[in-house]
Amino acid sequence: SYIFQDPLSTLHPLYTVGHQLIEAIRVHQSISLESAKSRALSLLKNVQIPNAEERLNAYPHELSGGMRQRVSIAMALVNDPELIIADEPTTALDVTVQSQILNLLDSLRRERGLAILFITHDFGVVSQLCDRVAVMYAGQIVEQGPTETILKSPSHPYTSRLIACVPKIGRGQGSLETIPGLPPSLDKIPRGCAFANRCANAVEACRSTDIKMTATTNRTHVRCIAYSFEKQEIMQ
């Protein structure tokens, strides 16, 4: 199942929450209208929506952002999925509601034994919920491995710069780290490492060699020529 970033634009404005949930249930399950309504009510209660009976008859615009996202989560649970893809599910929410939604997703994951694939740029979300991380740049995975390892000891230059851009509490005034340059156009991906033109450690081979994922000594895999050369030297 899929949880979209903005539930206000994905939930139909002309139909009630209950109508949309019941439709999703009956499209995939051959059950009566009454049974589908009972299932929809149960799902709303599972995602901790208060006064669930009343919310069944509410329209999306009558709900808060957090409530709408809970409805989206309920809809994602309709067919008891083994995997949920959550695309920036907390971006449009304030910090307090964001924490509630993340806690809800985590508890649902544990209770139902399902997996969640988070698409996010928020390292707070990553550190709170994710067991493993895959960092992507220009449509390619450039580094993957255990969350704690990657956040503490990133191997790819892009991952390092990305983490450095996160403001640190208690640092006081100072310049915010940035990554120079711009990402490449996706219809003109350069050969070699797509990050080479923005990387301070790039060499000519970075721009001319197809770089494969390489295992590192700290249980991660990285798409960087520095690690490819290092592995070749060890093998020799």
Q: What do the PLM-derived regions correspond to, one by one?
A:
Residues P50-E53, Q144-Q236:
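Short catalytic/signature loops enriched in Gly
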Residues I85-P89, L93-G174:
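P-loop NTP-binding/switch modules centered on Walker-like glycine-rich loops
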